Amino acid sequence: MLSLDLVFSFPAWALLLVLTLLYTLYLATTRLLLSPIRHIPGPTLAALSFWPEFYYDVVQRGQYFRQIDKMHQTYGPLVRINPFEIHIQDPSFYPVLYTGPTRRRHKWLWAARMFGNNTSAFATVRHEHHRLRRSALNPLFSKSAIQRLTPHLQHTLARLCSRLDGFAFTRQDVDLGIGLTAFAADVITEYCFGQSLELIGKDNFGKEWIDMVSAPSELGHLVKQCPWILVVCKWAPKALVRALLPGVALLFQIQERMSAQIQPLVDRAAAVDKPADPLTVFDFLLSSTLPQHEKTVDRLKGEGQTLIGAGTLTTGNALKTIIFHVLNDPDIFRKLRAEVDGALENMDILSMSDTAYLERLPYLSACIKEGLRISYGVTHRLQLIAEEPLIYSGVTIPAGTPVGMTSIFMHDNPVVFPQPREFRPERWFEADFETVQAMNRHFVPFSKGSRMCLGMNLAYAEIYLVLAVLFRRYEISLSGVTREDIEMAHDFFDPAPKEGARGLIVQLQKRG
């Protein structure tokens, strides 16, 4: 009784201070003294707390990758960047971490939940569960499947060209970056649902929808740190959520749209005993051998959110980056135009059976690889957990430790890619064989291993077709755009330019 009286006689602020000190002591003991990764070098504050990452990624908006780079400059290639995670900045370790299906690699739940869904193959934590979900999707994005999709890509690209012809006729500036992102969105939505969004025909290429799809990318930093926010917001009045956390409101809006798109497909699949040949991604999944609990609307809406986001934003950004750098260097533009004109004379690109011929054009291919390298693909570190201890440079990384690597540091490595921030397509065919092989090993815009990007073949097909058609069909010039309007300034999982960036504004003129 006396002890309780003593506690309640304390001022509230004093009690709070004591509890805070005790909690800090507990964290210091468990995270600094008892942690299985206490031997990994790194800043003490980062080992003690997630606050540094919160500050740089949430408050400063996607800047923690810069701090990680500074940590590596201070502590070396192996760094502890938060209480539980290690980051490695050494290209030679990439195939060890991002390995094939024979080595079990799990995702880290703390990171996997950043987009507010855990039902997509991308966000699946356990290795076996991911393999189940991914195996159902793989046939849809194989090289042969994308070849069969070529007429659909050409039809959508023809619609984009028809729209761009109007800008060419009026000599009006056009945001080609948004137009190309709309093209990618129309392609992936029609492939997923059998119905395109028709963004190409909308005012401003449906930029509002593209902004909505982009919103969860930046929001992911906050959700990762504070997952309870989504739970609270689901119960809060929608008007309040829109006012206080518009990114959360947009995320919920995307998820509602995914449910609305998928529900009719689920109903249709349930209504027939023997479905016809599947026409869309979700028709295929619903007719697959996946267990029934993997075919619910709640499960598949997460798959839809991931496929639409990845299939829209990363392809659009890659195209925007490549076209800017080609136009920004007259010599590169001249070489690419000469190759495309010479190789495709008297050929109709929009009626080719596939992109194999385009893929054999050396300078076009080099421009694409260099653009993918310099735009990074996904810019956020991709953490995986190995079941076995990993050894790096004689240091043991305990089993069960989240380990991440980042495409930015892979692609900007000056040893592998001299003058890494220069857009230089020639590096891919002028170097000797061993150097090119080394560059290929460290070229990871789609990551590698069993969890590499599902849509790589689709992205390549879109990029080859778009570049060949645009540079054959139009004279294109930049309209007051600088590299800062294109280049990554924020890591929102996907790369994002600086606030107020103009984008890829161009003028078009149809060639004779």
UniProtKB/Swiss-Prot annotation:
Protein name listed in UniProt: N-acetyltryptophan 6-hydroxylase ivoC
Species in which this protein is naturally found: Emericella nidulans (strain FGSC A4 / ATCC 38163 / CBS 112.46 / NRRL 194 / M139) (Aspergillus nidulans)
Domain of life of the native organism: Eukaryota
PANTHER family: CYTOCHROME P450, N-ACETYLTRYPTOPHAN 6-HYDROXYLASE IVOC-RELATED
UniProt keyword annotation of Electron transport present: no
Keyword annotations from UniProtKB, A to Z: Glycoprotein, Heme, Iron, Membrane, Metal-binding, Monooxygenase, Oxidoreductase, Transmembrane, Transmembrane helix
Gene Ontology process terms (BP): secondary metabolite biosynthetic process
Cofactor (UniProt): heme
Regions that span the bilayer: 6-26
Family recorded in the similarity comment: Belongs to the cytochrome P450 family.
E.C. designation(s): 1.-.-.-
Glycosylation sites: 118
PROSITE patterns on file: CYTOCHROME_P450 (PS00086)
Membrane topology: Single-pass membrane protein
Compartments it resides in: Membrane
InterPro entries reported in the protein's UniProt record: Cyt_P450, Cyt_P450_CS, Cyt_P450_E_grp-I, Cyt_P450_sf, Cytochrome_P450_monoxygenase
